């Protein structure tokens, strides 16, 4: 019921159009997190293949949600909670993910090029085959994260707790 109310509210406040591929298009939308809080936000929502390019979802509770193949490039997701969410193949290129929780989330094959993951919680996250080219992981926690096959070209690991046990606390 809460998910229905959330989507009803969103459909009443924004014009949501469908792309040719059937994905919802909420590009450039600023969501009122106060309203999302009243509706228990979007815990467990199915938002696969949705277009959230440059959307503002800062502080949103999206734990357990399905964002498979979602487009979130340039989005502001600072302080959001994606704990246990499925984000397989999602695109976060250039997104602000500062202090975002991805604890135990499935991030297999995601694009995180040039994303800001400063202070992010990536403990036990599956980042296998993820593209972290030029991503900033300063102060992030990657304890027990899976980075098998991940692309780490130019990734910043300053003061980061890595899965291989290094905290990089001496970097400047």
What are these regions (language model features)?
Residues 1-4:
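Positively charged n-region of N-terminal signal peptides that target proteins for export
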Residues 7-13:
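Bacterial N-terminal signal peptides
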Residues 15-17:
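N-terminal signal peptide c-region/cleavage motif recognized by signal peptidases
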Residues 21-172:
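Tandem repeat scaffolds
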């Amino acid at each position: 019921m809460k998910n229905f109310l959330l989507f009803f509210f969103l459909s009443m406040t924004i014009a949501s159009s469908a792309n040719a591929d059937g994905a919802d298009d909420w590009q450039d939308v600023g969501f009122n997190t106060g309203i999302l809080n009243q509706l228990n936000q979007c815990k467990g929502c199915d938002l696969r293949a949705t277009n959230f390019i440059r959307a503002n979802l800062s502080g949103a509770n999206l734990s357990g949600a399905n964002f498979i193949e979602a487009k979130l490039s340039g989005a502001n997701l600072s302080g959001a909670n994606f704990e246990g969410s499925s984000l397989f193949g999602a695109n976060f290129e250039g997104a602000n993910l500062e202090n975002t929780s991805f604890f135990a989330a499935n991030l297999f094959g995601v694009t995180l090029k040039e994303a800001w993951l400063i202070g992010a919680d990536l403990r036990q996250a599956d980042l296998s085959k993820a593209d972290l080219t030029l991503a900033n992981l300063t102060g992030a926690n990657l304890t027990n994260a899976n980075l098998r096959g991940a692309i780490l070209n130019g990734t910043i690991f300053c003061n980061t707790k890595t899965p291989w046990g290094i905290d990089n606390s001496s970097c400047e």
